[in-house]
Swiss-Prot record:
It is a lipid-anchor; GPI-anchor. Disulfide bonds join C28-C52, C31-C40, C45-C73, C77-C104. Interacts with CHRNA4 and CHRNA7. Residues 26-91 form the UPAR/Ly6 domain. The gene is LY6H. Glycans are attached at N36. Residues 1-25 form the signal peptide. This is Lymphocyte antigen 6H.
Length: 140
């Protein structure tokens, strides 16, 4: 059996992991005016950012359907929409020259390529939860 002090330490570590908030904020893909999403890079957002946004600007009149992609951290989806649907752009949107699509997500790297990344806290938590009982109740 493990000494009582080691069991106590194991329980304390488990409690800290389960009860603490992650030390990092949201992670989003980040790029500006690119035509290829693979040029976007992961970025750690500010604590005030709550969504990852993906904005696609398309020229519907183009036979090639030219488009540009903007991906970013944002405080809210409404903030992104206000920015991209500003008075300046609304003239182009209303006249059919541009089409703007805004999508927002609340999970890490959801505005990028599928499977782009996972939270290190999820990995640490899964590892500790799977090893925790073995450490606490292991025999000599």
């Amino acid at each position: 059996m493990l000494p009582a002090a080691m069991k106590g330490l194991g329980l304390a570590l488990l409690a800290v992991l389960l009860c603490s908030a992650p030390a990092h904020g949201l992670w989003c893909q980040d790029c500006t005016l690119t035509t290829n999403s693979s040029h976007c890079t992961p970025k750690q957002c500010q604590p005030s950012d709550t969504v990852c946004a993906s904005v696609r600007i398309t020229d519907p009149s183009s036979s090639r359907k030219d488009h540009s992609v903007n991906k970013m951290c944002a405080s809210s989806c409404d903030f992104v929409k206000r920015h991209f649907f500003s008075d300046y752009l609304m003239g182009f949107i209303n006249s059919g020259i541009l089409k703007v699509d805004v999508d927002c997500y609340e999970k890490d790297l959801c505005n990028g390529v599928a499977g782009a990344g996972h939270s290190p806290w999820a990995l640490a938590g899964g590892l500790l939860l799977s090893l925790g009982p073995a450490l606490l109740w292991a025999g000599p």
